[in-house]
Amino acid sequence: MRTTYMAKPNEVERKWYVVDAAGKTLGRLASEVAAILRGKHKPTFTPHVDCGDHVIIINAEKIELTGKKLTKKLYYRHSLHPGGLKVRTALEMRTNYPEQMLERAIRGMLPKGRLGRQMFKKLHVYRGSEHPHQAQKPEVYELRG
């Protein structure tokens, strides 16, 4: 009788991938990167084990949004003080904080517990085409579509 393979945390081999965000749509890029961080692209995927790979995203400032989202989409945060609600448009976020914009989209697609926080630590987002992870010899990952 065959049994289902369950990966052990010490058996997981991690790779490093580079994804170029230039000209890509935010949500489509985020969903594929979230799947890589979870490890769903591997045949040894196990839901309760962090078996994902490291992902480096470059050119974060060149991410695209469809429709009128650049001006209509709003990002909210609160300082936890009365009247402390801060609001930014997607255009402000892309101009000033493109890393946060991508991180926020991807974090929302990961599991919400301790395992999700562990997976999120394997995401590295940078403006421009330079990154400090050359020593890890990352492979270029081509996104679908």
Curated annotation (Swiss-Prot):
Pfam families found in the cross-reference section: Ribosomal_L13 (PF00572)
Single GO MF annotation: structural constituent of ribosome
Any GO BP: translation
Record text on subunit structure and interactions: Part of the 50S ribosomal subunit.
InterPro entries to which the protein is assigned, alphabetical: Ribosomal_uL13 (IPR005822), Ribosomal_uL13_bac-type (IPR005823), Ribosomal_uL13_CS (IPR023563), Ribosomal_uL13_sf (IPR036899)
CDD domains (alphabetical): Ribosomal_L13 (cd00392)
GO cellular component terms listed in the entry, alphabetical order: cytosolic large ribosomal subunit
HAMAP family for this protein: Ribosomal_uL13 (MF_01366)
Family per record: Belongs to the universal ribosomal protein uL13 family.
Gene: rplM
PANTHER family: LARGE RIBOSOMAL SUBUNIT PROTEIN UL13M, RIBOSOMAL PROTEIN L13
SUPFAM superfamilies linked: Ribosomal protein L13
Species, as recorded: Geobacillus sp. (strain WCH70)
Identification of the protein by name: Large ribosomal subunit protein uL13
Record-linked Gene3D superfamilies: Ribosomal protein L13
Range of residues in the leader sequence: none
Key words of the record: Ribonucleoprotein, Ribosomal protein
Function: This protein is one of the early assembly proteins of the 50S ribosomal subunit, although it is not seen to bind rRNA by itself. It is important during the early stages of 50S assembly.
